[in-house]
Amino acid sequence: MFCLDTNVVIFAINQRRPEIAERLDREIASGTPIIVPAIVLFELEYGCAKSTRPEQSRRALEIFLSVGFEQPAFDAEDARASGEIRALLESRGEPIGPYDTLIAAQARRRGATLVTLNTREFERVPGLSVEDWTA
């Protein structure tokens, strides 16, 4: 199972890194479960809302999501896991961004490998599998 980070979705939609879209197509064709967490959806919707072309951005996002990715809601267990991750990383002096903490918790709780271009940030999270499809 894979979990897509916001930057991966943006690159897939905009076709700026064709290797991401190609890998995504292969994983979808093979039936691999792929999730787009609630926090990623929030970040994408925010990007659409502040875009100079919000209608076009929103339509591109709708087309991308129409593939049928799992979109798990952020629940109480995700909140607990996020709090634990944030506290641990802060105690080590290695905090990551608050949204990244929430995304990491959703991926880790579901046993998903997080696909991101920001591996250095997410590799700090114990027990989280991370991949960069551009590497």
Language model regions located:
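Short, structured coil segments at secondary-structure junctions
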Residues: L65-V67, P126
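Active-site neighborhoods of divalent-metal-dependent phosphate/nucleic-acid chemistry enzymes
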Residues: E55, E70-V115
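Histidine- and aromatic-rich ligand-binding microenvironments
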Residues: D5, V36-P37, I96-G97, N118-T119
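Acidic, PIN/NYN-like endoribonuclease modules and their adjacent C-terminal/linker elements
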Residues: M1, A104, R108-A135
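Short, well-structured N-terminal submotif of metal-dependent ribonuclease cores
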Residues: M1-V36, A49-F64
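Generic structural signal for small/hydrophobic residues in well-ordered secondary structure
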Residues: D5-N7, L44, S82, A107, ...
